[in-house]
A protein has these predicted regions:
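Unchanged
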Residues: 39-62, 72-126, 148-161
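Short, glycine/serine-rich, charged loops/turns that create anion-binding
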Residues: 14, 22, 71
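Catalytic phosphate/metal-binding cores of nucleic-acid and nucleotide-processing enzymes, i.e., regions
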Residues: 68
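Conserved N-terminal beta-strand and adjoining loop/helix that marks the start
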Residues: 1-17, 38
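Short, active-site-adjacent segments that bind or coordinate small-molecule cofactors and metal centers
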Residues: 129-147
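A positional/architectural concept
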Residues: 29-32
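Short N-terminal binding/cap micro-motifs at the start of the first secondary-structure element
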Residues: 16-17, 24-27
Length: 161
């Protein structure tokens, strides 16, 4: 299982999203995702998050909030432990990203874009800044979400999609 980070950078009611269109054989190809990537040797989640955000966007985070851990289980892709952050305090100029197109998207419009079904669940939970840290397990068959557990308990995720 690989460890990754995912950061949702917010400004003026919008998230900076990455439309993954430049890499072939990418499990996120043509999907809209937050900013992130794989851990390097001996990195903490916070260090990986800051590095990945800078590498992909050119932005430096002054503060990021560690919001949840998502266990991504798939029948076709490598399992992943995704450390999810949000950030509102940052500086720098956005640069071109070699993985796709960076776009500020209204938070309410994200749900109509091609995103992973499970992302809709954790995005709704992290919209509440006071929602406590949580663990979310998402199991997929292909690109179809087939089960979800919040803090170890199965949830009826279809209500949240």
């Amino acid at each position: 299982m690989r460890n990754t980070t995912l950061c949702h950078i917010e400004k003026d009611g919008k998230y900076l999203m990455l439309h993954r269109i430049k890499k072939k054989n990418d499990l996120n190809h043509d999907k809209w995702v937050g900013i992130g990537g794989k851990f390097e040797e001996c990195e903490s989640p916070e260090q990986c998050n800051a590095r990945e955000v800078y590498e992909e966007t050119g932005l430096t985070l002054n503060d990021a909030k560690y919001r949840c851990v998502v266990t991504f289980v798939s029948d076709i892709w490598e399992s992943e432990l995704i450390h999810v952050f949000t950030a509102k305090d940052f500086f720098g100029d956005i640069k071109e990203c070699d993985e796709g197109e960076l776009v500020w998207i209204n938070k309410s419009d994200i749900y109509s874009l091609p995103i992973w079904e499970g992302d809709k669940i954790f995005l709704k939970l992290i919209e509440d800044e006071n929602y406590p840290f949580f663990s979310l397990r998402l199991q997929y068959k292909g690109e179809k979400l087939i089960s979800a557990e919040l803090n170890g308990k199965k949830i009826d995720f279809k209500e949240l999609l």
